[in-house]
Each structure stands twice: as C-alpha cells, then as structure tokens.
C-alpha cells in the first residue's frame, strides 16, 4: 500500500497524507460476520464522562474478527482484503473448505486467492498461517500472539506491528516485542506468521481537525490552558509551564508514570521495555 498526497488546493489538502486503499474490496462486509456498534460518547451507564474527548464520528458496524484461529487443519482461501473502521490493520475474509467464513487480521503480503491454515502441529511458515510457538522457527516474525492458551491473540495486532521469536527455554517461547520488551510466553500459545498489514498507517497526516472528528475524537484541551478550578495545571499570569510534574485533572501523576501492577506476571518479563534500548 502506498501513501496518497494531494494538490494544495486548501491548507488542509496541503498537509493531507492518507493510505491508498484502492486495492481493497469496495463492497459491504459479510452481514453474518458483523454486529451493530452503539456509540457511548465516552459515557458510562450513569451518563457520566469516563473517557474524555470521545464523541461523534462516522457510524460503524463491528466486524467479528477471529483472533483465536482454532479451526484446526481446515484449509482456508482468502476471498478478499477489506478495510475495517474499528482497527488500524486491514482484515481478510477467509472461506474454509467446509463452507464456513471468518475474518482474520491480514498480515503483510497476504492477497486474495492465498491459502491459509491453522494447526496444533507444524505447518508451512508463510503469512497468515497459525501454529503453536513451539513449532515456529526461531527468528520468525509473528503477530496475533496469545498470552494464555486458547484466549486468542493479544500481542501485535495493530497496523504494521509484529513480534519476533528469539528463543525457547523449558517449554516457553522468548519474544521480542516492538517496545523492546522481551518476555516469556507458553510454547503452546498460538501465533500467526508475518507482520500485520498497513505499515504506512504510521505515516498518515489527517491534515485538519475535522478528519480527526470523523474518527470519533473530540478536541483535546490541555490542563495548562484551563483555570485552577478545572485542572491542577491551570491558572497563572500569562503562559506557564504548569509548575509541577504532569498530572491528570484529578491530580494523579501521568505522562510516563508507570501503572503496571500485575506482580504475578513480572517473572515473565525478561527485559523491561523501560531499559535503555540497545
């Protein structure tokens, strides 16, 4: 996929850089594999804002994507690659030999007509195939990696992302993630071969605030431009720096403050993403 730029007929067109999606399927998604999606506007069941700066945006239908890939040893054919408004990656419609259909995350270099298969045994190392980490060759680029067997892929699912299998140790697989973290995952967890599609997503420029609003994001107001009644960083004469380490509107440290608290899985992390990247 290439990037598209536009003639500078307006200031926002001058800045605009988007992904060229002309090669994707142009019709509607498979109705049996979609669900309705209700907008929350960032509000909970009491009507109170629990996630700020969310609201509006184009209406979406939710595509049911198969992250588990537990249809073992049944070959599937990729019918088409589709756009999915609910994620940054593209999705692939797979038709299996028994007539069933499913959406999967499309890896790079997967095209219509390609064959994919998931198995509990070793299968070909080619994009879209899924097998346990214990059978994947060391050094392979993988995505949609399970953290618990049978739970479905959780690691490396967004556009252009991937993990690398760098070793094995006593039934565990050692993964290197995009963040620089190295961690252990059970060797019986499933993973798919290849890197996730749409790597150019990192290079897009919306060009104008309105295009961001179409995505359901509202204007994000900085605390430093508010009044003291509204934010700990507010107030002061003229422009100020906030006068303290960054905090949320409720006074909790933010911007780099570590929030991880799951001590039971600390032992699975061999190298923290916070260590200096070599």
Swiss-Prot record:
<dbReference type="InterPro" id="IPR014722">
    <property type="entry name" value="Rib_uL2_dom2"/>
</dbReference>
<dbReference type="Pfam" id="PF00181">
    <property type="entry name" value="Ribosomal_L2"/>
</dbReference>
<dbReference type="GO" id="GO:0003735">
    <property type="term" value="F:structural constituent of ribosome"/>
</dbReference>
<dbReference type="Pfam" id="PF03947">
    <property type="entry name" value="Ribosomal_L2_C"/>
</dbReference>
<dbReference type="InterPro" id="IPR005880">
    <property type="entry name" value="Ribosomal_uL2_bac/org-type"/>
</dbReference>
<keyword id="KW-0687">Ribonucleoprotein</keyword>
<comment type="similarity">
    <text>Belongs to the universal ribosomal protein uL2 family.</text>
</comment>
<keyword id="KW-0689">Ribosomal protein</keyword>
<dbReference type="InterPro" id="IPR008991">
    <property type="entry name" value="Translation_prot_SH3-like_sf"/>
</dbReference>
<dbReference type="InterPro" id="IPR022669">
    <property type="entry name" value="Ribosomal_uL2_C"/>
</dbReference>
<dbReference type="InterPro" id="IPR014726">
    <property type="entry name" value="Ribosomal_uL2_dom3"/>
</dbReference>
<dbReference type="GO" id="GO:0015934">
    <property type="term" value="C:large ribosomal subunit"/>
</dbReference>
<protein>
    <recommendedName>
        <fullName>Large ribosomal subunit protein uL2</fullName>
    </recommendedName>
</protein>
<dbReference type="InterPro" id="IPR002171">
    <property type="entry name" value="Ribosomal_uL2"/>
</dbReference>
<dbReference type="InterPro" id="IPR022666">
    <property type="entry name" value="Ribosomal_uL2_RNA-bd_dom"/>
</dbReference>
<dbReference type="GO" id="GO:0019843">
    <property type="term" value="F:rRNA binding"/>
</dbReference>
<feature type="region of interest" description="Disordered">
    <location>
        <begin position="218"/>
        <end position="278"/>
    </location>
</feature>
<dbReference type="InterPro" id="IPR012340">
    <property type="entry name" value="NA-bd_OB-fold"/>
</dbReference>
<keyword id="KW-0694">RNA-binding</keyword>
<comment type="subunit">
    <text>Part of the 50S ribosomal subunit. Forms a bridge to the 30S subunit in the 70S ribosome.</text>
</comment>
<dbReference type="GO" id="GO:0002181">
    <property type="term" value="P:cytoplasmic translation"/>
</dbReference>
<keyword id="KW-0699">rRNA-binding</keyword>
<dbReference type="InterPro" id="IPR022671">
    <property type="entry name" value="Ribosomal_uL2_CS"/>
</dbReference>
<comment type="function">
    <text>One of the primary rRNA binding proteins. Required for association of the 30S and 50S subunits to form the 70S ribosome, for tRNA binding and peptide bond formation. It has been suggested to have peptidyltransferase activity; this is somewhat controversial. Makes several contacts with the 16S rRNA in the 70S ribosome.</text>
</comment>
<dbReference type="GO" id="GO:0016740">
    <property type="term" value="F:transferase activity"/>
</dbReference>
